[in-house]
């Protein structure tokens, strides 16, 4: 029984390493200015995120995008922005969190409320330029 548990642990570690390697290879292959983007628009579609966790939506299926902000979970006072895609058929995405990386275009560790507001405005302008309604709450 102990052998099977050890084998299972090694298999899970191998899967985690493969997942991390795949995501890092995607990020490394991108040009530097593209690595820290949250939204990727292409062929009337928007992709959110990078790698295996990327979600793609057709622009014509999006009714609105909702934005909010709040204190980041388990942080020492850092703020996070949140975005939710609402589709025409009534379904909504999960809340997608982002930080000051959207504004600074480089990795940041602590973000204040002002930078989150600027990041939300950047994302709202990207959606509005493509004719999608955006609302900011709180």
Per-region residue spans from a language model:
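Residues marking helix boundaries in flexible regions
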Residues: 6-8, 12, 63, 89, ...
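Intrinsically disordered, low-complexity boundary segments flanking structured domains
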Residues: 43, 52-54, 119
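Generic alpha-helical hydrophobic packing signal
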Residues: 44-46, 57-59, 126-132
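Cytosol-/stroma-facing membrane-proximal "stalk/adaptor" domains immediately downstream
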Residues: 102-138
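Non-transmembrane, membrane-adjacent beta-strand/coil modules in membrane-associated proteins
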Residues: 33, 47-110, 138
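Alpha-helical transmembrane spans
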Residues: 1-35
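Short, exposed beta-strand/loop patches in secreted or surface proteins that constitute
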Residues: 37-42
């Amino acid at each position: 029984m102990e052998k099977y548990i050890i084998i299972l642990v090694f298999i899970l570690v191998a899967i985690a390493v493969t997942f991390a390697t795949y995501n890092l290879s995607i990020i490394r292959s991108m040009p530097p200015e593209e690595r820290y983007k949250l939204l990727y628009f292409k062929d009337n579609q928007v992709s959110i995120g990078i790698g295996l966790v990327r979600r793609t939506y057709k622009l014509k299926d999006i009714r609105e995008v909702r934005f909010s902000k709040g204190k980041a979970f388990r942080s020492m006072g850092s703020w996070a922005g949140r975005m939710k895609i609402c589709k025409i058929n009534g379904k909504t995405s999960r809340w997608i969190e982002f930080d000051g990386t959207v504004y600074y275009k480089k990795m940041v560790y602590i973000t204040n409320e002002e930078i989150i507001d600027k990041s939300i405005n950047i994302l709202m302008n990207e959606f509005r330029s493509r004719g999608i309604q955006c609302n900011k709450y709180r």
